[in-house]
């Protein structure tokens, strides 16, 4: 699915991505010399409020190894951004204990589906089981009443 590209917004995301990588200690420039690296990072930090300048900084200074990773990160961010606009595509996150995640993951693999689909399947199965149990109990009560008469 294609999503609209918004230059200003995406340039801000690119700037944030590069700054985060730099803060994590990963090389964001193509340079080896420390002074060149520092100068390039200073330029990057200086253009925080001028997002469109990030594109020229990327062309001029960014490490080629980071190119694909940056594109993938921005593509994922764009997808999440546009999916968050509609309630049916908005994602929610939950915390699971490791053992619960492991069981859910095994069930999802067994069913050949995603974790979300597995949860939905298990809930619908539990609901059907509950309805069947109520029906059986109701039949037992009716039968007991008939036999008592």
From Swiss-Prot:
Disulfide bonds: none annotated. Gene3D superfamilies: MatP, N-terminal domain, Met repressor-like. Keywords: Cell cycle, Cell division, Cytoplasm, DNA-binding. One of its GO terms (biological process) is regulation of DNA-templated transcription. This is Macrodomain Ter protein. NCBIfam families: PRK05097.1 (NF003471). The keyword DNA-binding applies. The lineage of its organism: Bacteria, Pseudomonadati, Pseudomonadota, Gammaproteobacteria, Vibrionales. It is found in: Cytoplasm.
């Amino acid at each position: 699915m294609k999503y609209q590209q918004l230059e200003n917004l995406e340039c801000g995301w690119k700037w944030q991505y590069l700054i985060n990588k730099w803060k994590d200690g990963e090389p964001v420039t193509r340079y080896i010399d420390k002074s060149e690296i520092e100068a390039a990072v200073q330029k990057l930090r200086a253009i925080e409020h001028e997002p469109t300048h990030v594109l020229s900084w990327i062309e001029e200074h960014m490490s080629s190894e980071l190119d694909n990773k940056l594109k993938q990160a921005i593509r994922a961010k764009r997808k999440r951004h546009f999916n968050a606009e509609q309630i049916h595509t908005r994602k929610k996150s939950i915390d699971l204990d490791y053992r619960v995640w492991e069981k859910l993951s095994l069930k999802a693999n067994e069913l050949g589906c995603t974790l979300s689909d597995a949860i939905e399947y298990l809930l619908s199965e539990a609901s059907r089981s509950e309805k069947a149990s109520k029906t059986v109990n109701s039949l037992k009560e009716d039968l007991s009443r008939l036999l008592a008469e």
